[in-house]
């Protein structure tokens, strides 16, 4: 199953890479976002899978027009990346009693 999932991610990324190598240089820099829409699409597919990644890329590409100001627009974190990790150091800091000073 993992091989199928990887293959499904590789195919659209290969098409995007062909665009980046052969078509984009002919058009020149046009994207109003950072990272560019094609880089965003590759990263979205890698982080979120083919279906959700293509959906995120489609939304991003639909915003890439002169009426939108553009700017920095990173790929959102995947659900597993957004969960806070169980970090014993941060837990110990949160569980320490606070000192109160009386005046």
UniProtKB/Swiss-Prot annotation:
Localization, per the record, is: Cell inner membrane
Give the start-end ranges of region Disordered. 68-103
Protein keywords: Cell inner membrane, Cell membrane, Membrane
> Membrane topology per the record?
Peripheral membrane protein
- tRNA processing listed as a keyword: no
Q: Does the keyword Lipid biosynthesis apply?
A: no
**Signal peptide residues on this chain, from the entry's feature table:** none
Q: Name one GO cellular component term.
A: plasma membrane
SMART domains per UniProt: Haemolytic
InterPro entries annotated for this entry?
Answer: Membr_insert_effic_factor_YidD
Q: Where is the composition biased (Polar residues)?
A: 87-103
Q: State where it is primarily located.
A: membrane
Q: Which top-level group of life is the source organism from?
A: Bacteria
What this protein is reported to do is described as:
Could be involved in insertion of integral membrane proteins into the membrane.
What HAMAP family does the database record attribute to this sequence?
UPF0161_YidD
Its family remark reads: Belongs to the UPF0161 family.
- Full protein name: Putative membrane protein insertion efficiency factor
What is the species listed in this Swiss-Prot or TrEMBL entry? Idiomarina loihiensis (strain ATCC BAA-735 / DSM 15497 / L2-TR)
């Amino acid at each position: 199953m993992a091989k199928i999932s990887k293959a499904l991610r590789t195919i659209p990324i290969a098409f995007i890479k062909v665009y980046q190598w052969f078509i984009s240089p002919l058009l020149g820099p046009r994207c109003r976002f950072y990272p560019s829409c094609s880089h965003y699409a590759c990263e979205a597919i890698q982080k979120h899978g083919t279906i959700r990644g293509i959906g995120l890329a489609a939304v991003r590409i639909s915003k890439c027009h002169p009426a939108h100001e553009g700017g920095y627009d990173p790929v959102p974190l995947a659900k597993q990346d957004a969960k806070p990790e169980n970090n014993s150091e941060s837990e110990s800091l949160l569980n320490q009693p606070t000192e109160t000073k009386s005046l």
